[in-house]
């Protein structure tokens, strides 16, 4: 669920209405949400605060935002940050941004079939490539790949109740 303004803002009003309805449903049913947010940080956050953050929980899928945006998301407390192959890209500053957050707030994602990590960039993404994202986080945090994998798996299990 979420808001995507990458191509245009023609249906922003409708996107916000539907997004807020879906947020309400997630609260009513105590279900986590995976928030898709593309060129719509302010709009997504406005909707979240409009609905209320109390029992809302989830993941900000495919996060590529700024340090300031990350800080705002972390204030929500019940949300994880979804990290995929973008963190491995040569020109991405996502690694620097993520240094401001604990591994215990991260979730590994593939976004398959898109956003393959280096060295598979430009190819169809596959779940097996997630290891490259874990390796990059291992480098960034100075932790073992096993620790990154175990911590992010535990985060996912806790969020989704599995």
Where are these regions (language model features)?
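Active-site micro-motifs of SAM-dependent methyltransferase domains
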Residues: 3, 114, 158
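Short acidic/histidine-rich active-site segments
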Residues: 104-126
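Active-site neighborhood of phospho(di)ester-bond hydrolases with catalytic His/Asp-centered motifs
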Residues: 34-35, 59-60, 82-84, 107-110
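Divalent metal-binding pocket/active-site signature
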Residues: 1-76, 88, 96-97, 101, ...
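Mid-to-C-terminal alpha-helical segments outside catalytic/metal-binding sites
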Residues: 128-162
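Conserved acetyl-CoA-binding loop of GNAT-fold acetyltransferases
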Residues: 78-80
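Conserved catalytic/ligand-binding micro-motifs in nucleotide and anionic cofactor chemistry
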Residues: 92
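Short, acidic/turn-prone active-site loops that include or flank metal/cofactor-
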Residues: 64, 85-89, 112-114
